[in-house]
Amino acid sequence: MFELAVKYIFSRKLQSLLMLIGVAFGCGGYIVFTSIQTGFQNFLKERLIENNGHITIRSREDYITPDSLAGVFFEGKRIYWITEPSGKRSHDYLQSAWYWQKLLEKLPYVVASTRRIEATTTCSRASFSRSISLRGVDPVNEPKVTNIAEDIIEGKLQMLSSGNNMVIAGVELLKFLGAKVNDTINIINPDGHVYPVKVVGIYSSGDRRNDESLVLGSITTVQNILESPGKITKIVVKTIDANKAAVFAQKLSQYSYDKVESWDQANVNFLSMTKQQSLIRQITMFTFILVVSFGIYNVLNMMVHQKQ
């Protein structure tokens, strides 16, 4: 049967050539479409991982419900609430940061970890002001976990250690404030206290949202601004395999009551979108194969009828 099909294909060279060109264009289009889609997905995943690490450890947030208070009042008794309790229990800062730091150094699946302190504050210069995301980082350990240092287009991350009032600001934020490197800007903490800081670098990630709001400082600098000495809000971890981050996060969650979350757990909606895109790609491939197969069958069928 195969020999017969080959014979008929080569007997009508022009038709076979046109069929081959059609198949080639179809295959090429599918390959380009798949490459663009897959490349875009991988790029977004890399950006998520590069900026936020594989695993994040932060203070746990618990919602208050009637079940969560079972046994607190009148243990063993059934309680009927006139107004059901609600709300949320949480800590602004990680209570066991140093414990985590020592533990992570001993685990074989942890490559590196770094501490952070983050808060939403306000930045101003002259009559201009804007809400910002203030992030205190460790200039030594941060590059081991994320690629944030590669997004600094002027200055270096290590310059944050040269003083207690040095910051690196997003390029769009500096444009809005009309500031540049070596200028002084003001950061207003949640209590309304103003702290002047010196811009020693410019950050540009290509993400306009970050570039308009992110301000980096050393951990000590940000602790001073927030008036929270020794406080840490999160620990970011890099593991030996980003694809197994959820498994490693599950293991880490057994060591403490703190919230341990992998990058894929924190971006469920994004991963759901990529799965839908992959499904669409598979359907497209199946449809393409079906159309090509039917086209080849029609060509061969026409050749057989012409021979008759």
Indicate where each model-derived feature is located.
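A short amphipathic helical element positioned immediately N-terminal to and/or at the very start
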Residues: 2-10
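Mechanotransmission and gating elements of multispan inner-membrane complexes involved in transport
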Residues: 61, 189-281, 288
